Amino acid sequence: MAAETASGSNRSISNSPLIENSDSNQILVPEKKSWKNFFSYLGPGFLVSIAYIDPGNFETDLQSGAQYKYELLWIILVASCAALVIQSLAANLGVVTGKHLAEHCRAEYSKVPNFMLWVVAEIAVVACDIPEVIGTAFALNMLFNIPVWIGVLLTGLSTLILLALQQYGIRKLEFLIAFLVFTIALCFFVELHYSKPDPKEVLYGLFVPQLKGNGATGLAISLLGAMVMPHNLFLHSALVLSRKIPRSVTGIKEACRYYLIESGLALMVAFLINVSVISVSGAVCNASDLSPEDRASCQDLDLNKASFLLRNVVGKWSSKLFAIALLASGQSSTITGTYAGQYVMQGFLDLRLEPWLRNFLTRCLAIIPSLIVALIGGSAGAGKLIIIASMILSFELPFALVPLLKFTSSKTKMGSHANSLVISSVTWIIGGLIMGINIYYLVSSFIKLLLHSHMNLVAIVFLGVLGFSGIATYLAAISYLVLRKNRESSSTHFLDFSNSQTEETLPREDIANMQLPNRVAVIGDLN
């Protein structure tokens, strides 16, 4: 395999579309322009897309279909389109600047705001891990009849299992998990054929926004939170740094374009899976000939009861197959969640932990509320906790989204690759709508809570003052991020060079090695 060494650099360039450098664990993208280069960029988008088909998504999809049939499909469409735009911006930030979102936040904000953003990001990682914990517990319950609360405790051991499997190579493990996850997707596609949802109703639900019935707004926010996750923005901006791309204007543009295409393909698959789950749940649970037993399951549908939806496809094996895929979904999401947690801690605090320790700490924080709810409320309570976790993610999204939008619109950070006026307008409209929906739901729900409360007047007043103070603080924090001007500093001096001129920059070996827990990490200068 022919290779050449770039002048004045240790970087190897090859005509092969995909090379992994064993010394740095980075994937090298050749200088020569070719459509085959696209294969060098495959990976980050699909890793990120795992979060869109995790147990939290399955839970919210199942409940929205069972309760509102196809009425909330438009949320999936809007969220998927928004996710594609937002995730592409996260990838662009990493590609253009050579730093991921958390590192930019550390460089941009003073100590107190930076620390608060780190805390919020860590809460988002833990909230994302809660559905994985509960989903895994449900899977163990279906496979081995283990009580849910014991299954929650056993999820703490998944860290050791994952570390053992990762010795065979992280990519092989991810391929196996992706295969199992898409097995359940195939089952839902086939079940979609058997359940025969009305195409007109499905299309109407996809393209006509509607929020009818009690709880529709809350479930819509849960769907939004399950689709557009804050930790994914940190994750995507860091994963792209594992590629050593030509640092020319044309090389960067090519990388951004290919990452957009890859993200589009990955999110299209995730979109089809989510639409299929909602459509199957809506068609089966709203059928006129539904048995009393299945109707009871639909009224309180969660991951632990959903296997009956696959009965037409795999018969008596439906619960086992669903459990295996649910287990795979939870564990694959655990891997990406671990990466996101590492990048968040490294970026905000310049602190790195061993992957097994990082995973264990996050999992312990997620186990505590999951265990309490599972003991008190059983599987039904655990299912509701998934919805709450998704809502938390939605409320935390602005604290990752606003910095991302401001950084990618900054000429000093992105140079000629900064967002255009159209892209900036579209992304700020998307962000504004998300924040507006969250604030409306938060205020209206809190007012309803106060009006229908049976507490005495003093307690209601105290709770009202406390609650509205919290809402005011939330709004003030978002306003600070939106209105604050970016620092006038640039780390992208190479962007002013000609299209053909290439500058070699320090490879992000620290980022590449963070994805390979079994190898020694390189701790180097981030600049």
UniProtKB/Swiss-Prot annotation:
It is found in: Endomembrane system. It holds the Pfam family Nramp. It is a multi-pass membrane protein. The chain crosses the membrane at residues 38-58, 71-91, 115-135, 143-163, 173-193, 221-241, 264-284, 321-341, 364-384, 385-405, 427-447, 458-478. Keywords: Ion transport, Iron, Iron transport, Membrane, Transmembrane, Transmembrane helix, Transport. One of its GO terms (molecular function) is cadmium ion transmembrane transporter activity. GO terms for cellular component: endomembrane system; membrane. Disruption phenotype: No visible phenotype under normal growth condition, but in presence of Cd, increased tolerance to Cd toxicity. Probable intracellular cadmium (Cd) transporter that participates in the distribution or availability of Cd within the cell. Belongs to the NRAMP (TC 2.A.55) family. HAMAP family: NRAMP (MF_00221). This is Metal transporter Nramp6. The gene is NRAMP6.
